[in-house]
Amino acid sequence: FDQIISKLAEDKNFVVAFNEVYPDGLNEKNITNAIQEFEKTLLTPNSRFDRYLKGQKDAITADEIAGYDLFKKYDCATCHVGEILGGQSYELIGVQHDYFADRQAEMTEEDNGRFKQTKAERDRHRFKVPGLRNIELTAPYFHDGSMATMDDAVRAMAKYQLGIDLPQP
């Protein structure tokens, strides 16, 4: 958590705003609580997508329907499940291709994923699957922030998890 605190502390405006809410400042407990409170705002029980799932076929656009069809076609719901479309399991990154070799960056402690907590070798490079509700608001993506856009993240997931190179739009 020291790396996270150091990174956050670099943004002086963030620190001022954070300290207004958490007077005892940046620490693991407060950061974890802030993330939990933020995640509560991501639930959208009556979104257009929810209405579509409940049978209102005109609630989303034709492009959005096509995207959802691809989501199902490529079995994204295998990991992105439940009301928030994820957040319920830890999965390995790089099932089909070596994400870390391709990234061409020095390995960090955070790259170990769940292993950092469990020390179980099976958890090395295993990360919590993010929920997809309001995901467009949470860039950059991946545990290391290496994917700047949703398009980058989707293409990377297709490559590293499924072994598929998605065509350009």
Locate each region found by the language model.
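Periplasmic c-type cytochrome electron-transfer domains
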Residues: 1-169
